[in-house]
Amino acid sequence: MKIFNSPIISKKYKGSAIAIGNFDGVHKGHQKVFKQAKKFAKKNKIRFGILTFTPLPVMFFNKKASNYRLASEDLKFKIFKKYGVDFLVNIKFNKTFSKISAIKFIKNIIYKKISPKLIFVSNNFKFGNKRKGNVNLLKKFGKKYDYKLLKINPFRNQGKMISSTGIRKCLQTGNLDLANKLLSRTWFIDGYVKKGKKLGRKLGYRTCNIYIKNYILPKVGIYAIKVVIGNKRKMYNGIGYLGSRPTFGGKEIFLEVNIFGIQKKLYKKRLRVYFIKFIRMDKKFKNSAKLINQMNKDVIFAKKGLKTKLVL
């Protein structure tokens, strides 16, 4: 898959089929778009590409939305490649780009620089300054700029439209089973281990404190997890805690994981944490003894929850 970090692409990629969108999470709805676009591209003997944006527009406009993404950029690109994407146009979403009107986006970016023959978007696609552009506007200019627009109806689960926003809500309410079903894989985050206050060790559980950057924060509480350390293939079982340590007066939310059978220090190591099962909500305990007692029970429940099948 050829990657272009601007809309200026090689001549051989012009006249292709492209899908446009943010594609955060690359869920089943997005996958439907890719499958149909690839099918049309093959039928017409042209290449298939994706036009997307970095960072996500909502993260650019709302600086407080730092914890928002469902998937890392690296994962998105790997999934694009899996679905047979020939090239990727990854446009930097900045102040200048955000001011481009919908009509100028069609003329100056799509027509003059990418020059596609087929464009695939979901029927609720919005674009351009203040999101004034929609599928009707895109279709209106198709004849003038020599492209055909194909709208993809949203993929539905039990009558409800699948969306990245809906999956975020699933994670924030602890509904991991539904989130994973809509993603068609087990949701995970990547993060680096940083030094903490070593409270876990004092409570009898050596833990890794993970720095979470940009990812959506799931519901605070205890989780059954699986962990991959660095680039190794081996997967470890464990228990994860997302919260602020209310028993000790904490306020900042962070992720702490206890990897079963691992006692060595993992500072600065990258961990991939798969969220398998939500066990319970966060809770403030009267003292450390009561917390330890509950932690022992949590480990038992986590081991039961880890019997759930992992989907990569």
Task: Give the location of each predicted region.
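N-terminal catalytic cores of NTP/NDP-binding nucleotidyl/phosphoryl-transfer enzymes
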Residues: 8-72
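Residue-level signal for inorganic ion chemistry
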Residues: 27, 80, 119, 179, ...
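Short acidic-hydrophobic, aromatic-tinged amphipathic segments that line or gate anion-handling sites
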Residues: 2-8, 89
